């Protein structure tokens, strides 16, 4: 996405992945959307993506040639044309609503129309291993900063500043929380269960991580030990370094989990150690795909070759996934969207409560 800098894109994905960490055995469906104004270059670019757990399944980009909601997972191909028509219309409606929300936000913050501004939203639901509703959420951001978010009870809102307080009062007067709660506890859960069944071969699988350690001297007195976990699914994983059995959390450099581009994930954890003391350090790996946690120790005689090509390819795809997929996720940075005088309406307004629509229609700030 041309209007978003690469560093921002990395933050977007890291935020998206952070959101996928739910309870063991639970599943989530989440939608991320971003609208970015570009003065002098036409209407804002609007991108929306949907995720079930760590897998992207739908995507809409207002700049795409098709101008349609498109499948991003094989198991979505079975949906009928009417489904795609409806979701496309919802996305186009949201793009127009967020265009107006951007204009309203300029007034709230007393900003000029010369600069580029961003509205973002994340909403979704989690279910337990039994398929029952666990929790729902909606969080919005303006220009990368928290704006407004639903509270845990889904009956009230938390505003981040005075501008968001205006939106909060409007939403309270229009009973938006009740509509959101009905969607999250009903429609969202119904569709998540459906997707988990249709895509169970992908969504309910576990791929154990491929692990190894590497060693790199950084001076005559110190070296970096790095613990690698590659090709794992789902994304949630724990990597920790210990020295003589004691956690080295404070001294560990831990990167965010990253998509490898093939449906699996990558992660590493590094620690700087005194030269000659490497054998005192062990890396501990915990993942759902492992029968029991792994313990790794660097062996001087078997220094593995770091799969540079695979890592670089993953990082390139990582940026691409973000730009296209999650130009929406800036770490729960929420879009301001309350309707100035209108209604919040769910994706299918009256009929979405009956499970006919998957996503929500936005609301103005």
Curated annotation (Swiss-Prot):
The chain crosses the membrane at residues 309-332. Residues 209-295 form the Ig-like C1-type domain. Residues 342-359 have a biased composition (Low complexity). Residues 1-24 form the signal peptide. Disulfide bonds join 125-188, 227-283. Residues 333-365 are cytoplasmic. Residues 207-298 are annotated as: Alpha-3. Residues 25-308 are extracellular. GO terms for cellular component: early endosome membrane; ER to Golgi transport vesicle membrane; external side of plasma membrane; extracellular space; lumenal side of endoplasmic reticulum membrane; MHC class I protein complex; phagocytic vesicle membrane; recycling endosome membrane. Glycans are attached at residue 110. One of its GO terms (biological process) is positive regulation of T cell mediated cytotoxicity. Keywords: Disulfide bond, Glycoprotein, Immunity, Membrane, MHC I, Phosphoprotein, Signal, Transmembrane, Transmembrane helix. InterPro entries: Ig-like_dom, Ig-like_dom_sf, Ig-like_fold, Ig/MHC_CS, Ig_C1-set, MHC_class-I_related, MHC_I-like_Ag-recog, MHC_I-like_Ag-recog_sf. Residues 338-365 are annotated as: Disordered. It comes from the Eukaryota. Residues 299-308 are annotated as: Connecting peptide. Residues 25-114 are annotated as: Alpha-1. The modification Phosphoserine is found at residues 343, 345, 349, 352, 356, 359. The keyword Signal applies. Involved in the presentation of foreign antigens to the immune system. This is Class I histocompatibility antigen, Gogo-A*0501 alpha chain.
